[in-house]
């Protein structure tokens, strides 16, 4: 199963370390049956968000901590070059990078907490779900997996 995690899910996993986002992040990095599909743009956005002063101070991170964790994530995921330029999310066009990353990486699922992306529900055969829904799918043994051709 190939998953693309939205930046908000990754931020939640980094900060909370508990809950659906953190559990999903851990599974995506350790389960052999799950491949995590990201792009450099998503990783840069993650690093930018986590190194904002208000985030670092509130959660006691240093720039070095963030870089180390993002680099570890980079090494344990499939980084795809994003060539697609689909424009789908009219309310927030910045969200299109997640759809394009998932499409170019042939992901089966996009996992997001973003209301604009969740409204899409399905994109080019890729289901858009929230972290709880994804954990439910995984716990059911991937029975909801729909492969794209």
For each predicted feature, which ranges?
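Short, well-structured N-terminal submotif of metal-dependent ribonuclease cores
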Residues: 1-38
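A secondary-structure boundary/capping signal
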Residues: 6-7, 38-39, 113-114, 130
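Residues that scaffold the ATP/ADP-binding catalytic core of kinase and kinase-like folds
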Residues: 13-14, 49, 58, 120, ...
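PIN-domain endoribonuclease scaffold, especially VapC-family toxins
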Residues: 28-85
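Active-site neighborhoods of divalent-metal-dependent phosphate/nucleic-acid chemistry enzymes
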Residues: 75-109
């Amino acid at each position: 199963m190939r998953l693309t995690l939205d930046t908000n899910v990754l931020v939640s996993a980094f900060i909370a370390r508990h809950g659906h986002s953190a559990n999903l992040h851990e599974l995506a990095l350790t389960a052999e049956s799950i491949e995590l599909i990201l792009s450099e743009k998503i990783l840069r956005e993650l690093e930018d968000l986590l190194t904002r002063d208000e985030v670092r101070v509130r959660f006691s991170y240093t720039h070095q901590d963030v870089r180390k964790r993002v680099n570890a994530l980079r090494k344990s995921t499939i980084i795809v070059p994003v060539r697609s330029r689909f424009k789908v999310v009219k309310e927030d066009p910045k969200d299109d990078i997640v759809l394009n990353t998932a499409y170019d990486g042939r992901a089966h699922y996009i996992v997001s907490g973003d209301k604009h992306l969740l409204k899409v529900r399905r994109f080019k055969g890729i289901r858009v779900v929230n972290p709880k829904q994804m954990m439910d799918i995984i716990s059911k043994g991937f029975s909801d997996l729909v492969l794209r051709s």
